[in-house]
Amino acid sequence: MKKQKGISYKTKGWMIVLLLPITITIYILAIIGWQQLVKIPVVQEWAEIINSSTAKLDVPTEYIELYKKAEDNYGVPWTLLAAHHRIETRFSTMDPLLSPAGAEGHLQFMPCTFVGWSHPSCGGLGKGDIPEKDKISPAIIEQYGGYGVDANNDGKADPYDLEDAIFSAANYLAASGAADGEIEKAVFNYNHSEKYVEDVLHFYHLYESQVKNLQAAAYSSQ
């Protein structure tokens, strides 16, 4: 009985060479087919539900209520406040909450922005030479037109108090146009850096998307 010969290595090599273009073509057609398929409304809903079921909001839950309270007061999207908080101090995990340039607190305010640029010591980058007691005085802040807010009514507007800092950021962003939908302009006004704007908007859009997906998942489960 003769022993059957297997396919030679040379033949296998030619088979791979011949099949490779076919495989690549099928792969490309599959991608194009999916791109066309996802344009169908029913398929879009199906894909969104799948994405929503695994959605997770990457914001510490203990801060969300404060963001939403500030949104109610100033009309600034709470997801934008969360994005600023993330970029400025990594949700207050930066230690200390003081930058080399002199920005202070949970949302990194320059003292002159917090207290007011009309303060006689203010100029340059805004570090100023403001007495510590005046930095947290609502009366002094009102006098010099600053953005610091006493959100918890304890008699102090303190950038190192989380609630005060979030409300102050919302106040500043609202005055810069965020409450009227001018998000990019407001973010740039907060920090005159294109990279900063890009980073904040990245997280803002991410959180907006995650919230939408979570809402869709909750709705689909009803």
Predicted features by range, described:
Residues 5-7, 27, 107:
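Intrinsically disordered, low-complexity regions enriched in Ser/Pro/Gly/Gln/His and often acidic
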Residues 38-222:
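Catalytic glycan-binding domains that act on GlcNAc-containing polysaccharides
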